[in-house]
Amino acid sequence: MKITKVDVLHLKTNLKNGHWRPIVCRIYTDEGIYGDGEAALAYGESQIAAFGIVQNFAKLIIGMDPLQHEVIWDKLYRTTFWGQNGGPVIFAGISAIDIALWDIKGKY
């Protein structure tokens, strides 16, 4: 199985304060299975950063096997410029992808 596409969505909510806008990614496979994950930075300006990092990370996983989530996690952590320096935005991006991969694995 291979990852064919990743959509990154900046959702809107109907909340009165309008500050909560989740970042969700959907990973598609060549076998028709998809998985959803969320970057947990949905408040304030960090949501924009989370959206950007998930978009950047998404490009790196196209063609990879979604069932090898540890290999993908390691690639995002070790081979990206900011990965090993960590921080909430980086780990929110990795987590969104990792959650979507587990969703795929559960549906497989």
Identify what each model region corresponds to.
Residues 1-42:
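Structured beta-strand/loop patches that form or line metal/cofactor-binding pockets in enzymes
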Residues 28-108:
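Metal- or metallocofactor-binding catalytic centers and their adjacent structured scaffolds
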